[in-house]
Amino acid sequence: MTAAQTKPDRRRLAHLLRAARSALDPDGVIALVAGILAAPAVIGTNWHRLVADPTPPALAEALDELQAHMAAGYHDGLAPADFARLPRPARLARLREALAAQGLDGFIVPRGDQHQGEYVPPCGQRLAWLTGFTGSAGLAIVLRERAALFVDGRYTLQAAAQADTAVFEIRHLVDEPAWRWLAGAAPKGGVIGYDPWLHTPHEVERFRSGVERAGASLHAVDNPLDQVWLNRPPAPLAPVVPHPDSFAGESAEAKRSRLGHALAEEGVAAAVLTMPESIAWLLNIRGGDVPHTPLPLSFAILRQDGSVSLFIDRRKLVPGLDRHLGNAVAIEPPEGLGPALDALATSGDRVQVDPGTAASWIFDRLEQAGGRIHRAADPCLLPKACKNPTELDGTRAAHCRDGAALTRFLAWLAREAPTGELTEIAASDRLEAFRRAGENFRDLSFPTISGAGPNGAIVHYRATPESEKRIEPRMLYLLDSGAQYLDGTTDITRTIAIGEPNDEMRDRFTRVLKGHIALAMARFPKGTTGTQLDAFARRALWQEGLDYDHGTGHGVGSYLSVHEGPQRISKAPNAQPLLPGMIVSNEPGYYKTGAYGIRIENLVVVQPANGAAQRERERDMLCFETLSLAPIDRSLVARELLDEEEIAWLNAYHTRVRETLTPLVDRETARWLAAATAPLGSD
C-alpha cells in the first residue's frame, strides 16, 4: 500500500506532535498541509519546520504520509478531483444563479488576484476555473444571457481550444477592449458587479465608463464566484525564509531606513505595499506561494521611521524568522490590514499608494475612512531594479552556472536531435535536469518554451502531450528558458537549426542577430529610456519589411521575478530612464506563422561607459554588459549580412563563452563548445 493510500492515524499523529512539542494539533496540521499543497513552489521537506523544529524522523514520516494522502485527492492543483470534474457549463450556470441572488446582471472575472501579479496561486485562478483558459493574460465577463472571454493576440488560438466556445465568445482585448464590449452588451438599467480586490482604480474607471454608456451601473461586490467554487483551494502556505545578506548585499534594516527617509522627504507618513516582490526585497525574505517566483504573498505598510507592519499568515514563517525581521517589523494577521488602513486614514497623514498596482479595495478603504492618499509608484520599485554590487556579482555567478547547464544541454541536443525521435517535452525535461544539478538552484524562473518548427512561432508556447512535436531535421528549434538561483535569476533564448537550415532561415536569423548585437553594443546618454533604444533591435528587420510583435526587453529581478519593472525596452511609451544596475533582457525575434520562430535572448545590465573615450565625451554615457553565456548557433549566421564590427562582437562573445564555461563542463561538452564558438568563417 502506498503512502497516498494510507489513511493517516490521527491518534498517532497527535502523540508525535506532543512528543515534538509542536504548537499544532492534528486539525492544525491538516489545515497547514492543505496550504502546503496549494503552494506550487515548495521544494523538499523544509515545510516540516513549520510543524516542529527540529522535526523528529517519526513525525517527518507521518507528515509525508499525510501530505501524500491529501495530495491524492487533488486534481491539477486546483480543486479536489470530484469537483474538478464538474462540467464548466455547470460552473457558469452556478455563477449565474449566484448573480441573480445578489441582484446582479453581470460580473467581471479577471485573471489576476489581489496582488495584481503575473503568477497566481491555485486559489486565485478564478478565470481558469470558470473558463478553462490558462494563459497569463485575460478576462471574462458573464452576463445573464451572454459570456465573453477576452485575450490578446498571443492567446486567441489557446482560448478557443481551452474554453467552451458554445458558451464563451472569444474576443480580442486589444481590438475590442472589455469595457467597450460592455458599453454595447450591458443591459440598460442593469447592475454589473466587480470584486474591488481584483482590479486597480484605473481598471474600475474604464469599466465604469463602459457600463454607464450602456445606461447600467457598476457596483463593488463580494465575489460571487468564490461562493460557487466549492472546495476552492486555501491560500498557499509555503515556508517563508530569510534571504541572507550575503546574497542581498544590503540588510533589511538599511533598506527600511533608506526608504523611510525618502518617504519623510516627500512628506508622506507611510506607504502601503501590495506587491509581494517589493515586500520580499525590502525585508530580505523569500517564499514559494506562486509558481516559479520565490514570493510569500503578503501586504505591508512601511512608515517613515523605517518600521513595517507585515500582514501575513504566521503559520508559514519558519522558526527564527522573527529574529531575522527584527523588532521594527510587526507581524500582523492578513485580516488586520483593513483596521491598519483605517488607523492611517484617521491620523490625517499622507499615505502613499501605487495606483498602477494596488487594488481598488485599498483606495476605497482609505477614502471611506477620510484618508489623504498620495498616488505614487511603489517606493521599492526603483531601488529594487537597480542592483547593488553584491547582487550583480551573484547574478554573474548564476549566469556562469546556468550557461554551463545550457551548454551541456546544447551539446546533448546536437547528438540526439538528428535522430528525429526527441520530443519538445523530453528536451525541456533534460535541460531542467542539467540545471537542477547546479549549485544554488531553486526552481525554473518560468515554464520553459520548447518549440519545434511551427510551435516556435507561437511566442508564449507551452508544450503539452497533445501539442508537442518531435524535433526533426530541417526544423528550427526555439528554446526560451531560465532558472531561479539563490544568487540570481536567469532568462535566455537560443534558436537552433536541426540539420541544414535554408536560406530564408539564415537570412531571418541573421537579421535578428544584427538587432541583438546593435542593442548589446549600444552607447547612450544618461536619461535614455528603453523606448528610445527599441529601434536598435528592429532596424535590420524593418529594412526588409519585417518585425516582431513583442517587446525587446523586460527587467529581471535578483532571485525574484523574471519580469520586473519599471524598466523595459519596447515600442510602448515608458518614461523610466535606464539606470546603472538595472538588468534587462535583449531579445529581438522573428516569427513565421506555421513554419518557425527565431529569438535570441541574453540578459544585460546597464553600466557606466568608462574608459579614455568616455572621458573625452561631453555627456555621461551608459552601455550594456552582457550577462548570459551560451553559444549562438553559427550555422544560422549569414556572414555576408554582418559587417566587420558585428563579426568582431560575435567572435569576442564566443571567446568569452568558451573561456568562461570550458572549466565548468565535461570533456565531451568542452569539445563541442570549442567547435560551437570557433571564430566565424574559420570552418
PLM regions: where:
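Domain-length accessory/inserted modules outside core catalytic folds
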Residues: 1-80, 84
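Active-site neighborhoods and metal-handling regions in enzymes and metal-associated proteins
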Residues: 82-683
